[in-house]
């Protein structure tokens, strides 16, 4: 049923595109590009909406495949030298019937790493529009989120799509894909024909179609073509909701339909919203906006979720209602005091104690909604979006950074784990459904029983073979082999005795007395030792001891979280006759497969905003200046004099305290 619907949508989309798309004017496009990118507005991208990815007709026909490969070759050959060559390169979709809101070509940005089987696909965010009025307003204010006519040829994105290891310690060398947001439907729409209710504009909403088409067109350029490939579908804000709604469908498309040996995971950043009563009544309630948007976009929702809400399927746009039905592993990052949630709740920038009280309750409600999430990272901060920010490595909970927690979760969801994570972390999150939360314990028990059974069978088989009588031919063959072994051993001993008789000196390894330990390598080492003077040998020993001490010191001082670097053993350098000055041994740094300190469920213990050291700074909405921490506490309605008395300090000392010191004291008091 769903496949037939999508076939019709694709056919209609081709006709509609030819009818409505307008030729682009190069000069006007250039002027719009310069004007737009000189001052891009900071868009609050709350992803309250999305719908599932679709089962459309297979786009990988021969002609389409040739076009995809040509696009990739053009992008690959256009890369120059320097930092510009590391940028993400633009590619339009080969299926031109799938478009942005205004009918312009949808597409993606790609930076391919030839030796990597990992793919990071990032869905952009940017709010949504849900009726004629809101879409017109969006077109006037945020046109770059509804058309591709202003897209540049290259993009540089930080965070999890950064190619720099200091900014992206674990995924800097993966294949990176950015899908710009131009459908205004939180990646959920399937409307291929223009909305006839708006006579002035002709909007299409194809977010789910765009995502599926991009994934399909990545296959010819390497996605899942090698066994053991991995796809991490990540999204921020509207993209975060898009990840949750499309994750299972994308996995089914790759694994079941395309028969690819690939592991699919999802990461939702700031896309987890609540349908609460707003602080003040808005012109259109958030629930009503979601319901209207679902109809306008013709959104497809996951069937497993809509079964739970048959009369109100649009409820599946909320993460806490959708999550229990997911089968593909999902990692959730969410600020406990999300700015987009505040916008949805119409609370505004927190200034008064009443606003702070409402926000405090909002944080508690959001924390409770994450109870059944098996992999979560939720700092007690006011913010929105983090995965694309260049300082995302600084966000920490309990000394575990966000990239480290994400890396731990990535390894915990692998089918075969032969590392320390299997013993040191919380239960695995390989399946996100709450009914399977304890399956890992039972699986380990079954594996133990199977190993015991296998060992018993092997032992019984060995005993049986031992008592069986060998035939005459088998006994003779075994006897012949033993005699040959004895002859070889005797011959080796005669050769060794002959060397000794001829005056050759053999260096015997005290740890291994086998004949193999005396060979040409030992003789060469002995000659080199004889050539060195006593002072040079002593200098060599000092250098080796110093290198070992430095290595042990680095291992002791290695941090428990953040960017984990471990030094390899110092390189051994050959000494020459004139090598009297010692050279420092070079150390090769590498990132370990799993951080030393892991955690799969990291929720901030304190319940008030900005109590985390790594929270983003706040600005006063009235003045635009950065708010001091005491100002924030005052706005929160706290009695500062009472706080000073509780901490045992005077007001002068309290006012002069640094933010980190004050947060430490308050956190210790709270604990």
Swiss-Prot record:
Q: What is the lineage of its organism?
A: Eukaryota, Metazoa, Ecdysozoa, Arthropoda, Hexapoda
Q: Where is the composition biased (Basic residues)?
A: 439-454, 487-497
Composition skew (Polar residues), residue ranges: 570-583
Gene assigned in the entry: Notum
State what protein this is by name.
Palmitoleoyl-protein carboxylesterase NOTUM
> What does this gene product do?
Carboxylesterase that acts as a key negative regulator of the Wnt signaling pathway by specifically mediating depalmitoleoylation of WNT proteins. Serine palmitoleoylation of WNT proteins is required for efficient binding to frizzled receptors. Also acts as a regulator of long-range activity of Hedgehog (hh), possibly by regulating the switch between low and high level hh pathway signaling.
> In the record, what terms sit under GO molecular function?
palmitoleyl hydrolase activity
UniProt EC number: 3.1.1.98
Q: Which domain of life is it from?
A: Eukaryota
Q: Any S-S bridges, and between which cysteines?
A: none
The signal peptide annotation in the UniProt record is 1-46
Species, as recorded: Drosophila melanogaster
Q: Which UniProt keywords apply?
A: Glycoprotein, Hydrolase, Secreted, Serine esterase, Signal, Wnt signaling pathway
Regarding protein family, the annotation reads: Belongs to the pectinacetylesterase family. Notum subfamily.
Which stretches does the entry tag as region Disordered? Answer: 411-592
């Amino acid at each position: 049923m769903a496949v037939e619907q999508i076939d019709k949508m694709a056919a209609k989309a081709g006709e509609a595109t030819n009818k409505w798309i307008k030729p682009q004017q190069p000069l006007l496009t250039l002027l719009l590009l310069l004007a737009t990118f000189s001052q891009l507005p900071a868009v609050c991208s709350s992803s309250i909406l999305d719908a599932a990815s679709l089962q459309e007709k297979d786009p990988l026909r021969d002609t389409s495949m040739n076009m995809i490969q040509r696009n990739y070759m053009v992008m690959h050959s256009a890369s120059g030298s320097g930092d510009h060559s590391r940028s993400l390169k633009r590619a339009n979709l080969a299926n031109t019937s799938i478009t942005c809101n205004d009918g312009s070509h949808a597409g993606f940005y790609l930076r391919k790493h030839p030796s990597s089987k990992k793919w990071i696909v990032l869905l952009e965010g940017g709010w949504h529009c849900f009726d004629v009025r809101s879409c017109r307003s969006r077109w006037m204010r945020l046109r770059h989120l509804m058309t591709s006519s202003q897209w540049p040829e290259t993009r540089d994105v930080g965070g999890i799509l950064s190619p720099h290891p200091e900014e992206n310690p674990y995924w800097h060398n993966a294949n990176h894909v950015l899908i710009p947001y131009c459908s205004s439907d939180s990646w959920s729409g399937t409307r291929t024909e223009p909305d006839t209710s708006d006579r002035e504009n002709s909007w299409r909403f194809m977010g789910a179609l765009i995502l599926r088409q991009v994934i399909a067109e990545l296959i010819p350029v390497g996605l899942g073509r090698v066994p053991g490939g991995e796809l991490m579908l990540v999204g921020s804000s509207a993209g975060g909701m898009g990840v949750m709604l499309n994750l299972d469908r994308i996995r089914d498309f790759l694994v079941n339909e395309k028969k690819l040996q690939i592991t699919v995971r999802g990461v939702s950043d700031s896309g987890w919203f609540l349908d609460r009563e707003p602080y003040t009544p808005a012109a259109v309630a958030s629930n009503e906006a979601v319901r209207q948007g679902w109809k306008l976009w013709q959104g497809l929702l996951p069937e497993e979720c809509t079964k739970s809400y048959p009369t109100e399927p649009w409820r599946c746009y909320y993460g806490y209602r959708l999550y229990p039905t997911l089968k593909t592993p999902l990692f959730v990052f969410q600020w406990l005091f999300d700015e987009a949630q505040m916008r949805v709740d119409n609370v505004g920038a927190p200034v008064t104690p009443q606003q702070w009280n409402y926000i405090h309750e909002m944080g508690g409600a959001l924390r409770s909604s994450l109870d059944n999430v098996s992999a979560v990272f939720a700092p007690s901060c006011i913010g929105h979006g983090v995965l694309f920010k260049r300082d995302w490595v600084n966000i920490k909970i309990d000394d575990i950074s966000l990239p480290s927690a994400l890396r731990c979760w990535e390894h915990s969801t692998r089918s075969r784990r032969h590392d320390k994570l299997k013993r040191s972390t919380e239960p695995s999150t390989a399946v996100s459904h709450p009914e399977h939360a304890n399956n890992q314990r039972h699986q380990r028990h079954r594996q133990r029983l199977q190993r015991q059974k296998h060992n018993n069978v092997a032992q019984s088989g060995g005993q049986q073979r031992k008592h069986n009588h060998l035939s005459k031919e088998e006994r003779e063959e075994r006897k012949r082999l033993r005699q040959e072994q004895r002859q070889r051993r005797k011959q080796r001993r005669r050769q060794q005795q002959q060397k000794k008789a001829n005056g050759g000196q053999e260096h015997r390894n005290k740890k291994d007395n086998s004949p193999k330990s005396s060979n040409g390598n030992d003789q060469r080492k002995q000659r080199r030792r004889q050539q060195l003077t006593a002072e040079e040998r002593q200098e060599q020993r000092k250098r080796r001891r110093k290198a070992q001490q430095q290595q042990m010191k680095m291992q002791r001082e290695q941090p428990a979280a953040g960017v984990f670097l471990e030094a390899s053993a110092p390189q051994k350098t050959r000494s020459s006759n004139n090598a009297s000055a010692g050279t420092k041994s070079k150390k090769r740094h590498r990132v370990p497969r799993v951080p030393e300190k892991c955690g799969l469920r990291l929720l901030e213990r304190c319940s008030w905003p900005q109590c985390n050291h790594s929270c983003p700074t706040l600005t006063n909405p009235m003045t635009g200046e950065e708010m001091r921490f005491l100002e924030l506490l005052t706005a929160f309605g706290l009695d500062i004099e009472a706080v000073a008395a509780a901490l045992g300090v005077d007001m002068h000392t309290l006012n002069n305290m640094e933010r980190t010191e004050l947060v430490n004291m308050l956190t210790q008091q709270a604990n």
